[in-house]
Amino acid sequence: MMMNGQKMAAAEVAVQLPESKMVTENIGGAAAAMRPFGRKAEVMNVLLRVLCMVTSVAALSSMVTAQQSSTVSIYGFMLPIQSKWSFSHSFEYVVGVSAVVAAHSLLQLLISVSRLLRKSPVIQSRSHAWLVFAGDQVFAYAMISAGAAASGVTNLNRTGIRHTALPNFCKPLQSFCDHVAVSIFFTFLSCFLLAASAVQEVIWLSRSKY
């Protein structure tokens, strides 16, 4: 009787082992589907967030420090002029969008780093990926529109207006124009980094099964 009981127990174990193996394989497959990216790609995503935050803060700080006073000659008269970023709606737009993008990048960076430290997927689901993708797309378009608007104003300051006596204001206001140019450069760079993040999310969505 004892021998028969031991044989039955061994048979039950033999039957249960394949089932346990199948459950483990299913869990592993689900985890792989939820993490189509490797750790290197997730670290790259975090690095993009860091760079985007740095460039947007640089664009913001360069613009808000753009102010200068000088004199300019118009029809032979020396007139005092003062230039400040807040005098232009386009420059104010750059400041506002850069601040929002910096906050967005910081939030995504904190979320990604916390999940990396817990060794969990940076992107948890398709809905999360779609949400982040939409945010990156919207902010990328906002940054490129802000940079384009600021570029138009800056170009006018550098060239003046044809057929009028208005001069090249960037000659007496060189420091102001340099600050604005640096801000515009970082604005377009932030747009590129947001676009790169959006491409990563598209790749994640194409590889994910859930």
From Swiss-Prot:
Q: Does the keyword Repeat apply?
A: no
Q: Ranges in the Extracellular compartment?
A: 67-92, 150-178
Instruction: Please give the superkingdom of this protein's source.
Output: Eukaryota
Lineage of the organism: Eukaryota, Viridiplantae, Streptophyta, Embryophyta, Tracheophyta
Q: What are the record keywords, sorted?
A: Cell membrane, Glycoprotein, Membrane, Transmembrane, Transmembrane helix
Q: Where in the cell is it found?
A: Cell membrane
Membrane topology category: Multi-pass membrane protein
Fill in the subunit field for this protein: Homodimer and heterodimers.
Instruction: Outline which residue ranges sit on the Cytoplasmic face.
Output: 1-45, 114-128, 200-210
Q: Where are the transmembrane segments?
A: 46-66, 93-113, 129-149, 179-199
Q: Entry's InterPro entries?
A: CASP/CASPL, CASP_dom
Q: Which residues are glycosylated?
A: N157
Annotated protein name in UniProt? CASP-like protein 3A2
Q: Which family does it belong to?
A: Belongs to the Casparian strip membrane proteins (CASP) family.
Cellular compartments per GO CC: plasma membrane
